[in-house]
């Protein structure tokens, strides 16, 4: 990446990239927080969802994003959420109880089973969503207020990303079906 391209990426909170020399229609957008307020882009995608929203994020404390998922469920969209078990148990702002109250299917997961130090297993540290089998949101961005206003984070939005969305959907379903 040239210095000019890197400078442009740092100055503009949402950058759209299109594949060059390809018939592919996939559009990639990048958002950087805290200046980019990535939650606004996530909210837009949730609000436009028609059939399915699959969300796997380590930390979920953002009230607006949680409410948008509840509204999507009320519109008839299938919504499923996977969050990290330890984060949810140790953070009073985590939205696990909210999702249960809204009857949104929820899994509290740990990471893959492996011995790490003095504990078994790691973290469920994924940060992605698949929307209507054609949109993928992924990056370092946890769905928290801190991610929007304090932390240096990134979010990639892939639209019209059928094959990529299917890979992420498979990864989500593997998490969902893993024994607790």
Q: Where does each model-flagged region fall?
A:
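HKD-type phospholipase D/PLD-like phosphodiesterase module
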Residues: 20-48, 66-67, 71-180
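Bacterial N-terminal signal peptides that target proteins for export
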Residues: 1-7
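Short catalytic-loop micro-motif centered on adjacent basic/acidic residues
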Residues: 53-57, 81-83
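Secreted/periplasmic proteins that engage bacterial cell-wall peptidoglycan
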Residues: 58-61, 65-68
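Polar low-complexity intrinsically disordered regions
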Residues: 1, 16-22, 58
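Bacterial N-terminal signal peptides
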Residues: 7-16
């Amino acid at each position: 990446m040239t210095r000019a391209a890197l400078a442009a990426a740092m100055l503009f909170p949402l950058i759209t990239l299109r594949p060059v020399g390809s018939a592919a229609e996939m559009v990639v957008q990048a958002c950087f927080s805290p200046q980019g307020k990535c939650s606004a882009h996530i909210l837009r995608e949730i609000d436009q969802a028609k059939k399915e929203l699959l969300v796997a994020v380590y930390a979920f404390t953002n009230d607006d994003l949680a409410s948008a998922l509840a509204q999507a469920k009320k519109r008839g969209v299938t919504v499923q959420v996977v969050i990290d078990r330890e984060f949810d148990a140790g953070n009073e702002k985590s939205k696990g109880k909210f999702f249960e109250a809204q009857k949104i299917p929820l899994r509290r997961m740990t990471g893959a089973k492996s011995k790490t130090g003095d504990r078994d297993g790691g973290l469920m540290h994924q940060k992605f969503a698949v929307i209507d089998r054609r949109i993928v949101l992924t990056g370092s961005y946890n769905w928290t207020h801190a991610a929007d206003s304090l932390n240096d984070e990134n979010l990639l939005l892939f639209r019209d990303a059928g094959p990529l969305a299917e890979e992420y959907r498979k990864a989500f379903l593997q998490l969902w079906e893993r024994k607790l």
